[in-house]
């Protein structure tokens, strides 16, 4: 599984449109995603203090768009991610049937995030 952090509003818009398109798809040519081990470092580095975020759990085999594993787009990984880790980048819109779960990304009083609980998914 791979994961993408977004706002509930963006996800609701995706459901209305029939596909999910992050702003980065237009500006960088791909949608940033993470492995489960990368989610918290990414969330706490780039989204600290932001409420109303959700986490999309995505099954790569169900994606219609191309998926590539690449170094972080900024060069060095965020603190907490080992040097050399590759990140999943989706080069196109995310088809909704590839999203297996949508869960709230909990926010602590200090502005840091916590990993949500996922339910098992049988494909």
Please identify what each model-predicted range represents.
Residues 1-123:
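Conserved, structured core segments of small domains
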């Amino acid at each position: 599984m791979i994961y993408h952090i977004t706002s509930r509003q963006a996800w609701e818009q995706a459901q209305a449109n029939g596909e999910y398109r992050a702003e980065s798809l237009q500006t960088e040519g791909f949608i940033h995603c993470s492995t489960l081990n990368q989610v918290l470092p990414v969330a706490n580095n780039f989204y600290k203090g932001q409420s109303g975020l959700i986490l999309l759990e995505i099954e790569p085999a169900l994606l219609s768009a191309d998926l590539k594993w690449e170094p972080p787009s900024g060069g060095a990984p965020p603190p907490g991610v080992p040097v050399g880790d590759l990140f999943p980048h989706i080069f196109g819109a995310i088809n909704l049937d590839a999203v297996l779960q949508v869960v709230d990304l909990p926010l602590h009083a200090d502005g840091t995030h916590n990993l949500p609980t996922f339910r098992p998914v049988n494909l």
